[in-house]
Amino acid sequence: MLYEVQFLSYNQRDQVQGWIYVPAAKPKGIVQLVHGFGEHSRRYLKMIVQYLDADYIVAADDHVGHGKTAIVNNNSWGDWGDKGFHTMMEDEHSLHDLVVEKYPDLPYFLYGHSMGSFIVRDYMSKYGDELAGATICGTTGVWPDLEKGIQILEQDVA
């Protein structure tokens, strides 16, 4: 079963577009997908099907400035509004609350890819006690030449 959901974004400007996918069998838990920059949640349909086949509910939305949320709100791609990154994290929490209202007794997991991994990290620092776990995928690591690049930029700006 598929439910389409909408909710007012934390930015008080946009209607976030989301989906709740429910398996045919009794669900074992919930996985909320948090997509990356320039993506949309339906990019993950193959993964969603795998979770459904494993009897997990999947929740996903398109961030402000992304996918169907940007289209419905007539926004430019990447227009997050004020406090964009924080807005996306709080919007993920709003989706969590919608799902938990329907399915209150299931373990809840977040899966964040790329920029979504940073949103999940921020989420865990504030709401981590609401989660059974999280997967952080495609995140950044140490860049050995980053310090050198910063020094070059500082010299150019000075």
Regions found by a protein language model. Give the residues of each.
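N-terminal cap/lid segment of alpha/beta-hydrolase-fold proteins
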Residues: 1-23
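Proline/glycine-enriched tight loop/beta-turn segments at coil->beta junctions
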Residues: 14, 22-30, 56
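Glycine-rich nucleophile elbow surrounding the catalytic serine of serine-hydrolase chemistry
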Residues: 112-122
